[in-house]
Amino acid sequence: MKRKVALGCVLMLSAMTVLSGCGGGGDSEGGTSEGGKTKIRFASWDVAEDVDRQQAIVDKFNESHDDIEVTLEAYGSDFDTKISAGMGSGDTPDVMYMWNYPAYYEGLEPLDEYIENEGEEYKTNFYDTLWNYNSIDGQIYGVPVGFTTHALFYNKDLFTEAGIEEPTGDWTWDDLQTAAKTISEKTDAKGFAFSMKPDPYDFEMYLWSNGTAYCDEEGNMDGYINSAESEEVFQMFQDMEKDGYAIATEKNGTDEFRAGQVAMYVYGSWSINTLNEDGMNYGVTKIPSFGSQPSVSILSSSGVSMSKDSENKEAAWEFIKFWTNEECNKERIGLELPVLNSVVESEKIMEQAEYAPFYVMLEQSDGYTPASFIMESWSEVSEDLSLAFEEAFNPSTLLDVKEVLESSVQ
């Protein structure tokens, strides 16, 4: 999985504007080919070798279906631009990868009836939490294909060098800070790294873990983003930086972790392949908790959706079913974490130490709704929060946390 569900939702407002003006019209290249096959288009955001792997799966579908022909359209970094333009002109691909449902759902076909017709076993084979991230206002607009939660990565060699025990699943943030201090004192590395300008979508998980959020169910921020629980979270991160055993990085911390400059950081499963290729001696465990409260993670999730304007919806659904079946879920391991219970079991994913924590965090994170799914003005709010967070965490500023959070609700 290459995309994050609401990567700042930077295109939300423009996409909503486009969607508000889109009308009927089908896709311009849909219909029937000369061979009598129903032609459908499938849009992906992947690039390079990932596209090659996707094309191989599309080829398998085409070879096994005499009546449907799928064409893969790899948009890469132009994905959002082309999907928005397609929805505005009525020329959207029949099937597409999807992440930013708040922005695009008006141009998508609700899939509840299709899913219901497949029977209860079809839906329950997916991890239930993932349906929440592929739905808007109780309606499902995408079938899950990939996800990641976040977990704590740690450098085993640095823990050995510092002479301390490795992190465990019952760690609290106090435990992490104690270890980070020791590592900073006994090695040339810092104990922990986090982004000086974290993605607000991601950072809300820390507030959830401490009993609060950015806003309530109506989108009201006052009393939430500036609550005592929220202040405690932000103050903890800032204090770790001030005390010198954590660093605030320009990106997400992966570069510093790979270089052996930091012993721990929290991130999604995206870096696993890279760390394995590096031959790094690392471990993964759950995000630490605040006291006795279970830690919670945000989900970065992707689904496969159908255009509401598709003239070939039955064929599109047939392809969606194929793309989300067990065989294809297995073939995409490495691109995306499996979303089917049956595949996780058959491939013994929970026995793989680097992957299991992401599923444990998935189970612990059910029932939380990101502010991006609640607030209509999330695009603007996200930009404001990002700037505010940078003021609190940038080592050149380190503004007062309470003042920063109060300014976020004004």
Where are the regions that the model predicts?
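Extracytoplasmic/periplasmic solute-binding protein
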Residues: Q139-V145, H150, T160, D175-D222, ...
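Glycine-centered hinge/linker elements that transmit conformational signals in sensory
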Residues: A180, G219-A248
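A structural signal for short loop-to-beta-strand junctions that line the ligand-binding cleft
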Residues: A85, D94, E120-L158, P294-V296, ...
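Extracytoplasmic "Venus flytrap"/periplasmic binding protein-like
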Residues: K60-F126, E161-G163, A263-M264, T274, ...
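Hinge/lid segment of periplasmic solute-binding proteins
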Residues: M98-T149, N281-T285, M350-E354
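Mature extracytoplasmic/periplasmic domains
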Residues: S302-S377
